[in-house]
Amino acid sequence: MKTFAAYVITACLSSTALASSITENTFWNKEFSAEAVNGVFVLCKSSSKLACATNNLARASKEYLPASTFKIPNAIIGLETGVIKNEHQIFKWDGKPRAMKQWERDLSLRGAIQVSAVPVFQQIAREVGEVRMQKYLKKFSYGNQNISGGIDKFWLEGQLRISAVNQVEFLESLFLNKLSASKENQLIVKEALVTEAPEYLVHSKTGFSGVGTESNPGVAWWVGWVEKGAEVYFFAFNMDIDNENKLPLRKSIPTKIMASEGIIGG
């Protein structure tokens, strides 16, 4: 079996350069084929320099709606602009029915990220406003930076798009506190993203644009990074989805790949 280490090469950190210098690891495609899923997984190992591999070079640089993975930059922007006062702020539930029962309660920033509370982040975006939102997306070099489609839904059904490669670049900048934002605010959001903590730490966020149709599928995401010993592994996964029953695959497929590489599990 050929492992990640056999495929990675040094990559530059501009979006175009990274997309053109990732190595393709077709061995990973067996996990996608086993589930009859079209998708991509990008995995980058950060040692002295970043080295990356993917199962699908073309799809790695193709842009999709970020859906709820956008909660990561949205939270940072909210903190930077003062819309979110600090990590202790409580977002009050107004008592009105919401799409998911787990959203029908008061939530902290971490809680809102963990349950992916769309209404909370829509309100944050409305208070940030278009001018400041646009400014920060440009500062972050986040996707196509297109916020057309409504200030409270441009990442859900509007025109914002981002590739798996760009997700990895953004996450690496966040990990290194190199975004154009205060170190304190980046640390707050990083802490809120911790989803697992066994012998390694996983900081991650899922996203889901809706199921779509067979001819026009939606997209499901899982992005983040794994801290294991002295190594950090950044990852971004997305897949076409036309059946909600397939949603768990957004985590199970990349988890299997990372387990096969000895990064998590085992």
From Swiss-Prot:
Signal peptide: 1-20
UniProt EC number: 3.5.2.6
Entry keywords, A to Z: Antibiotic resistance, Hydrolase, Plasmid, Signal
Residues reported to bind substrate: 205
PANTHER family: BETA-LACTAMASE YBXI-RELATED (PTHR30627:SF6), PEPTIDOGLYCAN D,D-TRANSPEPTIDASE (PTHR30627)
Catalytic class of the enzyme: hydrolase
Any one GO biological process: response to antibiotic
Official protein name in the record: Beta-lactamase OXA-7
Annotated family: Belongs to the class-D beta-lactamase family.
Function noted in UniProt: This is an oxacillin-hydrolyzing beta-lactamase.
Modified residues (N6-carboxylysine): 71
Catalytically driven reaction(s): a beta-lactam + H2O = a substituted beta-amino acid
Record keyword ATP-binding present: no
GO molecular function, one term: beta-lactamase activity
Highest taxon listed in the record's lineage: Bacteria
Source species: Escherichia coli
A Pfam family recorded for this sequence: Transpeptidase
Active site per the UniProt annotation: 68
Record-level GO cellular component terms: plasma membrane
